[in-house]
């Protein structure tokens, strides 16, 4: 199938082939648009531009659907662990059985330790340095320790690179946190599961099982591990978002893969991307009380007020974000099973959602809750500090970045990314 482009100035007609998709709309192949017509396409923000063909994840914004390699996100969250999803994203296959799942997870556990020299680098940062700045730097430094990943040729090379960074990113994030608060570094405990280890390194005390709560001392519960596991799965990948596209763009230059991942971390830092869940919680704090919700909703509608309601709306989803639905259910489940929630903030969030889902202003603009709206409330209940919400996002998303990077570098169509511009200067 082809599409005809007509130049109305001279009535010249140009034929462009279309590219079929297995899900979603077709694409018109404009790769030779300039060569054929003398024109560039102009698409600020690339909202109508496909920069690649991918088999990793698919988002149906109208229907509110998300798939990882053909599997519905609802099924993956319900039936599989995060490490199984990691294997799916990196290899295209879920574990066939428990033994295969454990084998993959044990590899991640054993690769989770980091070179001691990194500790000196982290200690050199000011104590108030943002953890995302430190984490991005730490991943970049990893490229100096594993220089062989600069030249990958076999599938084993690719998988080693990806699994190494997926294994180490929780350790780096935990070091960033404990360095900031002045607590001793806790090394990975390979006897713990991959996900439990993350909570242990963030929350635990040295040389002992976790003892942290405001009401008596209890260890990490299986319920907490399960909840955190689901959060990581929900954040593992999301098609060509800003950070994933950044990873692909930087990787296209031939740079060390960990430098590309570092760039992805920097992109995720922004409050319009990964930093949004932190902003949601801070905004709920600002609202302060259920009785103030109407006032803030009115501010959203006021054309003279720049106030924006965080956690609502999405560039792709024009319906309820499926990840937000899962997180809302998870929040309710945790509350019912006795996990302590911030009742005040939960009530404010529920009231905001109740009003927004019925208000014509939000409905007309397709402003529905997104993944950030409830994730912060749950992370706080899991005793994750607010400043470390975005690093948690990094932990979950690193495997998706690796999958995107590998898909790009292994593609015979891969080229250095070089967008055009419409010059309007003197």
Swiss-Prot record:
**Gene Ontology cellular component terms for the protein in this record:** cytoplasm
Q: Could you tell me the keywords of this UniProt record?
A: Transferase, Tricarboxylic acid cycle
Transferase among keywords: yes
- A Pfam family matched by this chain, by name? Citrate_synt
Q: Where is the active site?
A: 314, 372
Q: Which reaction does this chain catalyze?
A: oxaloacetate + acetyl-CoA + H2O = citrate + CoA + H(+)
According to its UniProt record, in which pathway does this protein act? Carbohydrate metabolism; tricarboxylic acid cycle; isocitrate from oxaloacetate: step 1/2
* Species of origin: Helicobacter pylori (strain ATCC 700392 / 26695)
Q: Which CDD domains has this protein been placed in?
A: EcCS_like
Transferase in keyword set: yes
The text of the family note is: Belongs to the citrate synthase family.
A GO BP term here is: tricarboxylic acid cycle
Q: Recorded E.C. number(s)? A: 2.3.3.16
| Protein known as | Citrate synthase
Remarks, anything else?
Citrate synthase is found in nearly all cells capable of oxidative metabolism.
Gene name linked to the record: gltA
């Amino acid at each position: 199938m082809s599409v005809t482009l007509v130049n109305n100035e001279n009535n010249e007609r140009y034929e462009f082939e279309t590219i079929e998709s297995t899900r979603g709309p077709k694409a018109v192949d404009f790769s030779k648009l300039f060569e054929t017509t003398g024109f560039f396409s102009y698409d600020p923000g690339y909202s109508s531009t496909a920069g690649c063909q991918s088999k990793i994840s698919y988002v149906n914004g109208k229907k509110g659907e998300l798939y990882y390699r053909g599997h519905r996100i609802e099924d993956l969250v319900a039936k599989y662990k995060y490490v199984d999803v990691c294997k799916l994203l990196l290899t295209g296959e879920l574990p066939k059985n428990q033994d295969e799942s454990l084998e993959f997870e044990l590899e991640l556990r054993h690769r989770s330790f980091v070179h001691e020299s990194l500790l000196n680098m982290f200690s050199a940062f000011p104590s108030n340095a943002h953890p995302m700045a430190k984490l991005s730097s730490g991943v970049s430094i990893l490229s100096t320790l594993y220089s062989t990943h600069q030249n990958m040729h076999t599938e084993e090379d690719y998988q080693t690179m990806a699994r190494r960074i997926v294994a180490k990113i929780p350790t780096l994030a935990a070091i960033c946190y404990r360095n900031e608060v002045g607590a001793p570094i806790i090394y990975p405990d390979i006897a713990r599961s991959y996900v439990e280890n993350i909570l242990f390194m963030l929350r635990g005390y040295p040389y002992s099982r976790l003892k942290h709560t405001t009401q008596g001392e209890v260890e990490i519960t299986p319920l907490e591990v399960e909840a955190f596991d689901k959060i990581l799965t929900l954040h593992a990948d999301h098609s060509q978002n800003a950070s994933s596209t950044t990873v692909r763009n930087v990787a296209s230059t031939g740079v060390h893969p960990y430098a590309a991942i570092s760039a992805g971390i920097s992109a995720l830092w922004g409050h319009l991307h990964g930093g949004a869940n932190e902003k949601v919680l801070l905004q709920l704090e600002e609202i302060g009380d259920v009785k103030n919700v109407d006032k803030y909703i009115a501010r959203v509608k006021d054309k003279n007020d720049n106030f924006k309601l965080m956690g609502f709306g999405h560039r792709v989803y024009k319906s309820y974000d499926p990840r937000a639905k899962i997180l809302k259910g998870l929040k309710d489940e945790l509350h019912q099973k006795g996990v302590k929630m911030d009742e005040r903030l939960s009530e404010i969030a529920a009231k905001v959602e109740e009003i927004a889902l019925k208000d014509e202003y939000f409905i007309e603009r397709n402003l529905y809750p997104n993944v950030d709206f409830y994730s912060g409330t749950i992370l706080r209940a899991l005793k994750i500090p607010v400043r470390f919400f975005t690093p948690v996002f990094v932990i979950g998303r690193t495997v998706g970045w690796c999958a995107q990077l590998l898909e790009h570098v292994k593609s015979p169509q891969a080229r250095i990314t070089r967008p055009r511009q419409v010059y309007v200067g003197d």
